[in-house]
C-alpha cells in the first residue's frame, strides 16, 4: 500500500514536475460495422464508438477530480480503416474519414486514430483506397489521424509502401499549406507498429484486440529530470537505479488511472505505455534529462548512450510496476514538442542524422521534424527507409513523422501550436537517393526473422 511519504511525493510530482496522464485512449473494434451501404457503414461506426466513447471525457474528468492528477487528453483509436474499405470506392472511403471526425467532435475527444493501412507485405484494395485519400481526409478534418505500417521484422520492408508514403506526406503538406503543412503532424509511417499504442498520431486498434479496450500513456520527463538533478555526483549505475525507481512510481499512477477508467466504462483494461513523452512546457523535456546527466547539449557525443540508459531504466522500473506494459514504452524524442531538442537544433548540436542514431535505442523514431518544403519526395522516402531499417533489423518499433513545410527553408521557424509546439526547420542531405528508392519492391526480412 501507499505510505504518507509516497503520497506527498506524488503530489510534488504533479504540482512541480509536470507529472500527468498524457492520454486515456479507448480502442474500438470496427470489424462488425461494415455494411453493403457506405451510409449504413458510417452510421454503424459512429454508433459503435458512441456506445462507450460518449462517457470517455466525463470519465477522465471524474478521475481527475478523484485522484487530483491531470489527464491531458481523452482519445479514441479504431480498427485500421483499410480493413473496412475494400468493398468501397475512394470517394466512399473519404466518407468514413468524415464519420470519424463527426463522432470525435460529438463525444469531445481531441484526436481519433486509425485512418490507417498495414502494407508491410503488399497492398489490398482497401489499403489503396485509404492511402489515396489520406491527404484529403487530413486536410478536411481536424481530429482524424493516419498511420501506415510499411515494414515488420518478419516481413521485411515494402519499398513501394515507403515511396507511396513519401508522396502522401508531400501531398498532405501542400493541401495544408495555409497551416505550414500541419496535416503531416497527423501521419506516422511505422515499422513494427504496435496494436495497442495509446499515443497519437500513430494509434490504431489491432485486430487481435477486444471490442473495447482502455490503454493509458503517462508523461513524466520533468519528474525524471528532477531526480537526475538531485544526484549530480552519482555514477551511471546509481543514476540508472534512481531513474528506474522513479519510473516505477510514475507507472503505478498510470495503471491505477487506467484500471479505474476501464472499470467505470465497463470495458477491458489494456496496457500502460511507459514512454516519457515531452511537451513544449518548461522543464517537461527529454533533452533536458540528457543534459542534466552531464552533456552540454542533447546531440553532443554520448547522447545515444545517455538515451539508451534512460530508456532501459524506464522500462525496467515500469515493468516492475505493471504486468500490463505495451504500446511504444521508452522515450519519445519529438523535436517540435521538446524545447530542449529545439535549442539543440538551434545551436547545431542536433541534426537528422544524430536523431536517427538516437532512435536505435529509444521508443519511436524521427518525430515532429520540420524540413524544407522543397525537399524531393525521393529524399523523404530515403529518410523513411533509413529509419524503418533500424526498426526492422533490431526487432523494434520505429516511425517517422516528418513535415515538409511549404515555402520555408532550413533555419526558418514554424509554429504548430499547442502540444505540437514550434521548431526550427532542419536541413536535409542534399545528395540524391532517387535511383535507389525508385527500384521499389521489397527489402527481404533479416535473418533474425527466422525464429521458429
Swiss-Prot record:
Q: Which residues cross the membrane?
A: none
UniProt xrefs under SUPFAM superfamilies: PFL-like glycyl radical enzymes
- What InterPro entries does the record tag this protein with? UPF0210 (IPR007841)
What is said about its interaction partners and assembly? Homodimer.
HAMAP family recorded for this chain? UPF0210
User: Can you tell me which family this protein belongs to?
Assistant: Belongs to the UPF0210 family.
Output this protein's name.
UPF0210 protein CHY_1509
What is the originating organism of this protein? Carboxydothermus hydrogenoformans (strain ATCC BAA-161 / DSM 6008 / Z-2901)
Q: What is the lineage of its organism?
A: Bacteria, Bacillati, Bacillota, Clostridia, Thermoanaerobacterales
